[in-house]
Amino acid sequence: MDRTCEERPAEDGSDEEDPDSMEAPTRIRDTPEDIVLEAPASGLAFHPARDLLAAGDVDGDVFVFSYSCQEGETKELWSSGHHLKACRAVAFSEDGQKLVTVSKDKAIHVLDVEQGRLERRISKAHGAPINSLLLVDENVLATGDDMGGIRLWDQRKEGPLMDMRQHEEYIADMALDPAKKLLLTASGDGCLGVFNIKRRRFELLSEPQSGDLTSVTLMKCGKKVACGSSEGTIYLFNWNGFGATSDRFALRAESIDCMVPVTESLLCTGSTDGVIRAVNILPNRVVGSVGQHTGEPVGELALSHCGRFLASSGHDQRLKFWDMAQLRAVVVDDYRQRKKKGGPLRALSSKTWSTDDFFAGLREEGEDSMAQEEKEETGDDSD
């Protein structure tokens, strides 16, 4: 296992060294150091087994970094500038040997992870800029574009396996069920889409919700589907009940721009206000704040292969790492204790709030809409 994902070793001062040749001890941090890019990242992904992080930026460049809690050991391994416009999404293959990227230039690229060599390019893969990417298995991938188009690709073949256009707006995000049968899509038209990729057919669209659906993920062991929205609301659907929502949970956030599951009940959201919120699903609670990009929107979130680190990208051109240990230890009780109004949002890591951070006055989420939330939760907390 990589050192970063192990417990940090205890310092051993038993070894004697020549004072004249002693070097300053290596500092071990709680999280890797921030990575500073030349442009904001618009795609982010962790390697499935190694301590590597890939990022694609709005200039079309793709980077792969090795990260470590040892100070000075987080480094760029390589970069690629093959895309002509913004790189919108990046994803590692299941075996970790390939990196797939998609771009506003309508192209799909497959890169070798070790050297960054471009192995395959599918030019004009869509008629519109590509916005989202999901790898189904080692050979098959799905892409969604700005006009609502969905395409399924087999890297061993020429041309798409499936080409659908049921949505009226851009495809913001996609998710897959464990059986790799149903592809779920979140769209700017406010609808959740369901596509059977085994039979290569369209199944249904949900009722449109208020605002764009910006993200989608499975929760509660696949029994629930959660969608984030541009209105700052999380919409919940029952599995096999995709036509209409079963519940909704409004955060006090301008929007939910990205979302990543941490456990079967906990997820993290990134918002325009720069705050990364930890949210429990059923019972619906904002648990606290994992971190923030001060005054800058959070565009992407990703969870490391060991689950220890959350990475975030903001318009401040920084990639930040957050320790998930404290969040994973949180226990959310079904009973809601009425908190004092005006209390601060609970910090879930040592570096959540900086001393000069104007977000330090951020108030507890949802207190003035408590009654509405409790009403919405009633009768739906059980699966």
Swiss-Prot record:
Swiss-Prot/TrEMBL WD repeat ranges: 36-75, 82-121, 125-163, 166-205, 208-247, 250-289, 293-332
Location (main, coarse): nucleus
Residue positions where Phosphothreonine is found in the record: 378
Pfam families, per database record: WDR55
Residue numbers carrying Phosphoserine: 14, 354, 382
GO cellular component: cytoplasm; nucleolus
Biological-process GO terms, alphabetical: rRNA processing
Subcellular location as annotated: Nucleus, Nucleolus; Cytoplasm
Family annotation (PROSITE patterns): WD_REPEATS_1, WD_REPEATS_2, WD_REPEATS_REGION
Claim: Manganese is one of the keywords in the record: no
UniProt keywords, alphabetically: Cytoplasm, Nucleus, Phosphoprotein, Repeat, rRNA processing, WD repeat
Residue ranges, annotated region (Disordered): 1-33, 362-383
Record's function text: Nucleolar protein that acts as a modulator of rRNA synthesis. Plays a central role during organogenesis.
The family this protein is said to belong to: Belongs to the WD repeat WDR55 family.
Name of this protein: WD repeat-containing protein 55
Organism for this UniProt entry: Pongo abelii
